[in-house]
Regions:
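Charge-rich, low-complexity intrinsically disordered segments
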Residues: 175-226
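N-terminal accessory/interface modules of nucleic-acid-binding and processing proteins
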Residues: 6-40
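A conserved beta-strand-loop-helix scaffold within acyl/acetyltransferase catalytic domains
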Residues: 28-110
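Acyl-donor binding region in acyl/amide transferases
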Residues: 79, 85-178
């Protein structure tokens, strides 16, 4: 793995980062046993989506804090578990888990959510929240576990975690312009570059404009905690 420090050091680093956050509500959410809202935004037709945060709980092998995306009916669409560690004297985010919905949630629900978010997949929405958290704190790099490196890769864990869809991490990180550093780890960009509207086909510009407005709303919602 990328980081050789023991688990105790990793935990200390994460809570040092949380202590550095100026807004107590955000710090409380990231350490709470129960989900607490950290961002909201309006999707298509004015529907409000919420990103909650909590301590990692049962996902503690994947990280220390978890982000959760829920729709206006409180359906869980995606979750992301991460920690903040130290590498070469700098604070870095490490994504240890990224899950879709429980199996009781149909793929049609995810398609509708993606359409409501103007083409942004639920996992991509959570990544935007993470990018904003990194940008507004002292994080200097973002790393992510690969398919090979995930703690639940073993068959017995996949069977025990069968309530969730398991999509390929490697494919998703590649879609974010990530770079594979080893069999176990990817490095992701600190921000996703946006195309200018001039680069986009005219028939798609209105949809992209709405997508950018949604991303701006997510940014403003996270920024309100800093």
């Amino acid at each position: 793995m990328l980081f050789r420090s023991d688990r105790a050091d990793a935990i200390v680093s994460h809570y040092y980062w949380i202590d550095s956050l100026k807004e107590s509500g955000l710090a409380l959410a990231l350490t709470s046993p129960q989900e607490k809202p950290v961002a909201q935004f309006h999707a298509k037709d004015g529907v409000i989506y919420t990103v909650n945060a909590s301590s990692a709980g049962k996902a503690e092998r994947e990280g220390e804090s978890t982000l959760w995306l829920r729709d206006n009916e409180d359906t869980l669409l995606a979750s992301l578990t991460f920690s903040v560690a130290r590498s070469n004297g700098q604070q870095v985010m490490v994504i240890g888990g990224l899950q879709g919905p429980r199996r009781s949630v149909t793929r049609d629900v995810i398609k509708l959510a993606t359409r409501a978010c103007h083409g942004l997949f639920p996992k991509r929405v959570l990544m935007e929240v993470l990018f904003q958290l990194a940008a507004r704190s002292s994080v200097r790099a973002i790393f992510a576990v690969s398919d090979e490196g995930h703690v639940f890769r073993a068959l017995r864990y996949r069977l025990s975690k069968g309530r969730h869809f398991h999509a390929s991490y490697d494919e998703f990180w590649a879609s974010l312009d990530g770079k594979k550093l080893s069999a176990f780890c990817w490095q992701l960009p600190l921000q996703m570059a946006r195309k200018s509207l001039e680069e986009i086909a005219s028939k798609k510009r209105a949809e992209y404009r709405r997508r950018f407005e949604l991303l701006d709303e997510i940014e403003a919602s996270v920024k309100s905690h800093f």
